[in-house]
C-alpha cells in the first residue's frame, strides 16, 4: 500500500497556494533522496540538482539521504552531477546510507557532510551476477566488470574519507556497518548533527 504525500497550503497576497511537501521543500533548496537507488529516482534527483544549480549556483543545495543503496550506475550518475554543478551540495544522512547510498552521501561538499546521531553507514563490495544458464565466457566478462566497478567505488570512498585504499578494500570485503561516531572517525562525514544548525 502506498503512502499519502502531505500537502502544504501557503498564504500570500495573491491567495492560497497548495504544494506537495517535496515541491515546497525544493523551494528551500532541499532534496529528499530516500528509498532504493534506481534509474527513475536518480533522474528525479539529477533534475532537481540541475534545476537548483541553474536557479542560483552560489547557494548550497541540501540533500537529505536515507537509502539502502541500489544501482551503481544510477548512483554514480547522481555523484557525477553533484560534482558537475557549481553549487555546494550539503549532505545530511538520516536513517541510513548503505552501499551506493554511502558513495552518494560521502560525495557531498567536504566540510558540509552531516549525519544525524542515530543514522548508520554501510560499506561493502558491489554485488552482481551473470544469471542462470550464462556461458562461461560471459561469466568471466561479468566478473571482470565487477572487479573494475569495485576498484572505482573503493577509490571514491578513499577519496571521500581519511582512509587508505587498502583499508577501504579490507573493510568493504564484507558488510561493514558504522554508527555516526564511527562514520565521523572514518572521515565520511564532517559533523554529527544534534540539532538543526544549518539555517
UniProtKB/Swiss-Prot annotation:
It comes from the Bacteria. The active site is at residues 99, 124. It catalyses: Hydrolysis of proteins to small peptides in the presence of ATP and magnesium. alpha-casein is the usual test substrate. In the absence of ATP, only oligopeptides shorter than five residues are hydrolyzed (such as succinyl-Leu-Tyr-|-NHMec, and Leu-Tyr-Leu-|-Tyr-Trp, in which cleavage of the -Tyr-|-Leu- and -Tyr-|-Trp bonds also occurs). It holds the Pfam family CLP_protease. GO terms for molecular function: ATP-dependent peptidase activity; ATPase binding; serine-type endopeptidase activity. It is found in: Cytoplasm. Keywords: Cytoplasm, Hydrolase, Protease, Serine protease. InterPro entries: ClpP (IPR001907), ClpP/crotonase-like_dom_sf (IPR029045), ClpP/TepA (IPR023562), ClpP_His_AS (IPR033135), ClpP_Ser_AS (IPR018215). Gene3D superfamilies: 2-enoyl-CoA Hydratase, Chain A, domain 1 (3.90.226.10). PROSITE patterns: CLP_PROTEASE_HIS, CLP_PROTEASE_SER. Its EC number is 3.4.21.92. It is an enzyme of class 3 (hydrolase). GO terms for cellular component: cytoplasm; endopeptidase Clp complex. One of its GO terms (biological process) is protein quality control for misfolded or incompletely synthesized proteins. Its main location: cytoplasm. Belongs to the peptidase S14 family. Cleaves peptides in various proteins in a process that requires ATP hydrolysis. Has a chymotrypsin-like activity. Plays a major role in the degradation of misfolded proteins. Fourteen ClpP subunits assemble into 2 heptameric rings which stack back to back to give a disk-like structure with a central cavity, resembling the structure of eukaryotic proteasomes. This is ATP-dependent Clp protease proteolytic subunit. The gene is clpP.
Amino acid at each position: 500500500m502506498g503512502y499519502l504525500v502531505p500537502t502544504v497550503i501557503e498564504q500570500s497576497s495573491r491567495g492560497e497556494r497548495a504544494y506537495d511537501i517535496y515541491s515546497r521543500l525544493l523551494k528551500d533548496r532541499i532534496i529528499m533522496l530516500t528509498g532504493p537507488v534506481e534509474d527513475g529516482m536518480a533522474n528525479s534527483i539529477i533534475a532537481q540538482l540541475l534545476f537548483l544549480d541553474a536557479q542560483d549556483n552560489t547557494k548550497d543545495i541540501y540533500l537529505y539521504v536515507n537509502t539502502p543503496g541500489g544501482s551503481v550506475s544510477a548512483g554514480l550518475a547522481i555523484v557525477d552531477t553533484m560534482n558537475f554543478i557549481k553549487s555546494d551540495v550539503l549532505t545530511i544522512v538520516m536513517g541510513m546510507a548503505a552501499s551506493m547510498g554511502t558513495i552518494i552521501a560521502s560525495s557531498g561538499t567536504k566540510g558540509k557532510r552531516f549525519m544525524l546521531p542515530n543514522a548508520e553507514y554501510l560499506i561493502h563490495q558491489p554485488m552482481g551476477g551473470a544469471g542462470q544458464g550464462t556461458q562461461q565466457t560471459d561469466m568471466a566478462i561479468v566478473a571482470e566488470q565487477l572487479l573494475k566497478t569495485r576498484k572505482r567505488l573503493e577509490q571514491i570512498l578513499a577519496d571521500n574519507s581519511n582512509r587508505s585504499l587498502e583499508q577501504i578494500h579490507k573493510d568493504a570485503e564484507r558488510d561493514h556497518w558504522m554508527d555516526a561516531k564511527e562514520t565521523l572517525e572514518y572521515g565520511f562525514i564532517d559533523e554529527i548533527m544534534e540539532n538543526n544548525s544549518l539555517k
